[in-house]
């Protein structure tokens, strides 16, 4: 088992691909290559479309790459699968993004949770998966992930990469299905300890900051985050399986004092987002990430 807390910029997405390659290599070095690889010589086609879960719902899933263990990318709050196929530098191109980079050396899949979106030049586009009543919980999302992987025909065990809210989903899935997990990468993952360094008012501000209204996402179909629902689940979640694990944490905070002040002045950030709040959130995040890394 590998324990690691690695600093990297939030959107240096090719770096994520390198770390995924490291996890795959470590898993193979631990004797996991036979169990994590599909049938020798099998060529798997690229796929994109709806996967029928068998319960009246379908989830949009895209997979690329023809060999090696399957990496499953689990996006952050409100983010569609194709957020892994763009970069902050150029949201119109997949060049330098995680999905094609990982597909260059192994099989990779990403999917739309219900209520997720992507921001395009024409505005927000909604999830391509069957809508569900919101708010859905992270354990609902972990169960959906299990149903999706079983229905898709993608072979495990899988290397799971969870960004932000995707981190708790990965942890719950891994705890429930340890034999189906070959490795884990957490990317700025939400943890149960994030609120430990915040006041009750700051925790409430964090939830408001992650609301659809604060982010400009369309109402009615949005994915929603409530710490009061997520934190108890994570505090009680069983230990993850003993597989190679990396905790990847940003070393730069995007909400600097300059960004906060200019955002408030322009009306792009709510009034409750103060420099004091964002500084406290950043400090608490760094501590929480160290605590998360110590769990593995």
Summary of predicted features, one role per range:
Residues 185-227:
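Flexible "cap/lid" loop of the alpha/beta hydrolase fold
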């Amino acid at each position: 088992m590998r324990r690691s807390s690695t600093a990297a910029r939030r959107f240096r997405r090719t770096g994520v691909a390198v770390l995924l390659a490291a996890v795959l290599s470590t898993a193979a070095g631990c004797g996991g290559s036979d169990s994590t690889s599909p049938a020798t010589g099998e060529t798997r086609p690229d796929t994109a479309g709806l996967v029928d879960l068998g319960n009246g719902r379908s989830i949009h899933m895209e997979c690329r790459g023809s060999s090696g263990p399957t990496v499953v990318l689990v996006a952050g709050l409100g983010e569609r699968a194709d957020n892994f196929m763009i970069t902050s530098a150029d949201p119109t191109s997949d060049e330098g993004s995680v999905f094609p980079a990982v597909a260059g050396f192994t099989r990779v899949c990403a999917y739309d949770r219900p209520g997720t979106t992507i921001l395009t030049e024409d505005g927000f586009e909604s999830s391509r998966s069957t809508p569900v009543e919101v708010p859905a919980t992270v354990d609902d999302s972990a169960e959906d992930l299990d149903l999706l992987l079983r229905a898709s025909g993608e072979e495990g065990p899988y290397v799971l990469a969870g960004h932000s809210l995707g981190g708790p989903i990965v942890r719950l899935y891994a705890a429930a299905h340890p034999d189906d997990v070959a490795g884990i990468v957490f990317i700025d993952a939400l943890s149960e300890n994030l609120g430990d360094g915040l006041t009750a008012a700051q925790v409430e501000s964090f939830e408001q900051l992650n609301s659809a209204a604060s982010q400009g996402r369309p109402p009615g179909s949005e994915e929603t985050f409530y710490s009061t629902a997520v934190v108890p689940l994570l505090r009680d979640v069983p230990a993850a399986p003993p597989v190679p694990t990396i905790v990847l944490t940003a070393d730069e905070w995007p909400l600097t004092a300059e960004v906060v002040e200019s955002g408030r002045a322009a009306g792009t950030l709510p009034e409750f987002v103060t420099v004091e709040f964002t500084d406290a959130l950043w400090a608490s995040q760094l501590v929480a990430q160290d605590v998360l890394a110590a769990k593995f």
